[in-house]
Amino acid sequence: MIGRLRGIILEKQPPLVLLETNGVGYEVQLPMTCFYELPDIGQEAIIFTQFVVREDAQLLYGFNDKQERALFRELIKVNGVGPKLALAILSGMSAQQFVAAVEREDITTLVKLPGVGKKTAERLVVEMKDRFKGLNGDLFNNTGDIQLPASNSSQISDADIEAEAASALVALGYKPQEASRLVSKIAKPGADCETLIRDALRAAL
């Protein structure tokens, strides 16, 4: 199992990053809350990973620390929650916010996440509450919130950036029409892709 990668970032295409380690390029999917914190292309990054094997693919999911990965591992144990939905959940809100929503039994907030209906939200509350007891550390202090660094603007048109942001939302589980609506709702001139994705995810909640 691949549990940790250290290498140079070659490409960033939300929610995917290409990381070169010892001459090998690894494609890693990250929750957007983790993606925002990645360094720029060409810089070194350390990513904690979860290797997932499916019938048609072998996938790597990445996280900024072991606790975020531990939460992902617990999420995919919940009935009806696979890696794709777990990635969408942790993209839609920070780990702290998710823990807080579960502990408050806030079904209304949870159902706003892509792919989460009422029954899934109820299962998350029932099954995850007990699991939190084994997850320790500052990440699971539900009074906190993630701080998102500013990103550098690229030299492409606003329309292209908005299309890229909408594509990232589709990859996270939103329907194309809903993704476009969310991006259009929060779009502003000069905004970079990561800002649009972040603001769209916040608007969805």
From Swiss-Prot:
GO molecular function (one): ATP binding
Origin: domain of life: Bacteria
Keywords: Cytoplasm, DNA damage, DNA recombination, DNA repair, DNA-binding
GO cellular component entries: cytoplasm; Holliday junction helicase complex; Holliday junction resolvase complex
SMART domains registered for this protein in UniProt: HhH1
UniProt keyword Signal present: no
Location of the protein in the cell: Cytoplasm
Region (Domain I): 1-64
Region annotated Flexible linker, chain positions: 144-156
Alphabetical GO biological process terms: DNA recombination; DNA repair
Record family assignment: Belongs to the RuvA family.
Function, as annotated: The RuvA-RuvB-RuvC complex processes Holliday junction (HJ) DNA during genetic recombination and DNA repair, while the RuvA-RuvB complex plays an important role in the rescue of blocked DNA replication forks via replication fork reversal (RFR). RuvA specifically binds to HJ cruciform DNA, conferring on it an open structure. The RuvB hexamer acts as an ATP-dependent pump, pulling dsDNA into and through the RuvAB complex. HJ branch migration allows RuvC to scan DNA until it finds its consensus sequence, where it cleaves and resolves the cruciform DNA.
Record text on subunit structure and interactions: Homotetramer. Forms an RuvA(8)-RuvB(12)-Holliday junction (HJ) complex. HJ DNA is sandwiched between 2 RuvA tetramers; dsDNA enters through RuvA and exits via RuvB. An RuvB hexamer assembles on each DNA strand where it exits the tetramer. Each RuvB hexamer is contacted by two RuvA subunits (via domain III) on 2 adjacent RuvB subunits; this complex drives branch migration. In the full resolvosome a probable DNA-RuvA(4)-RuvB(12)-RuvC(2) complex forms which resolves the HJ.
Protein's name in the database: Holliday junction branch migration complex subunit RuvA
